[in-house]
Amino acid sequence: MPAYKRVLLKLSGEALMGDDAFGINRSTIEAMVNDIAEIVKLGVQVAVVIGGGNIFRGVAGGAAGMDRATADYMGMLATMMNALALQDAMRHANIEGRVQSALRMDQVVEPYIRPRAIRQLEEGKVVIFAAGTGNPFFTTDTAAALRGSEIGAEVVLKATKVDGVYTADPKKDPSATRYTTISFDEAISRNLQVMDATAFALCRDQKLPIRVFSIVKPGALKRIILGEDEGTLVHV
């Protein structure tokens, strides 16, 4: 019996690279889609917000000297490429994925329309939200918090390459330990980089919990949906 009826899955663009240095690793994206298919079969309504850092990041070195708003719009276009790749992989897995974009690109994808997105979720389709919030200076983490709040998701599932939130960077500090649960306020006071501050504040204000987990850990997503202890739960 699923613990959640409707979830917002946040996928980072970097996670799509797999072991590659850039771009989209096909086997990695197929593995992600298989994980999503597992929970769709359980009757869970799934929406996805996808990043673009595997292609372009508005705040990264490649954007040095560039107008920040222009760089952010380029990052939004990168998320569109990832969203189309994810939708295509879903089609091969017999899942109907619908891409809705915060920036209009009508020949390619639908515009973001909240009632339509909710209806598609209720029909069992996976809705992929592209182009972040459609505004520069806002991250795709903030888009995940915003869209999760708008569609009435019960939890934001933040898929990363580490299996939760740690007391310190586990790659740099071998003594770092993982939190199983932590409050928003404690995470803020300890300056734990779960999400950027805007996304974090929005989730806290909307009482929308965040579960941080490893997308590369086999079966992790399904275990979360079944209510098992996986990753770190950030709560009010």
Curated annotation (Swiss-Prot):
The keyword Kinase applies. CDD domains: AAK_UMPK-PyrH-Ec. It catalyses: UMP + ATP = UDP + ADP. Keywords: ATP-binding, Cytoplasm, Kinase, Nucleotide-binding, Pyrimidine biosynthesis, Transferase. ATP binds at K10, L11, S12, G13, G53, R57, T160, Y166, D169. Gene3D superfamilies: Acetylglutamate kinase-like. InterPro entries: AceGlu_kinase-like_sf, Asp/Glu/Uridylate_kinase, Uridylate_kinase, Uridylate_kinase_bac. One of its GO terms (biological process) is UDP biosynthetic process. UMP binds at G52, D72, T133, G134, N135, P136, F137, F138, T139, T140. One of its GO terms (cellular component) is cytosol. It comes from the Bacteria. GO terms for molecular function: ATP binding; UMP kinase activity. Its EC number is 2.7.4.22. Pathway: Pyrimidine metabolism; CTP biosynthesis via de novo pathway; UDP from UMP (UMPK route): step 1/1. Its main location: cytoplasm. It is found in: Cytoplasm. Inhibited by UTP. SUPFAM superfamilies: Carbamate kinase-like. Homohexamer. Belongs to the UMP kinase family. Catalyzes the reversible phosphorylation of UMP to UDP. This is Uridylate kinase. The lineage of its organism: Bacteria, Pseudomonadati, Pseudomonadota, Betaproteobacteria, Burkholderiales. The gene is pyrH.
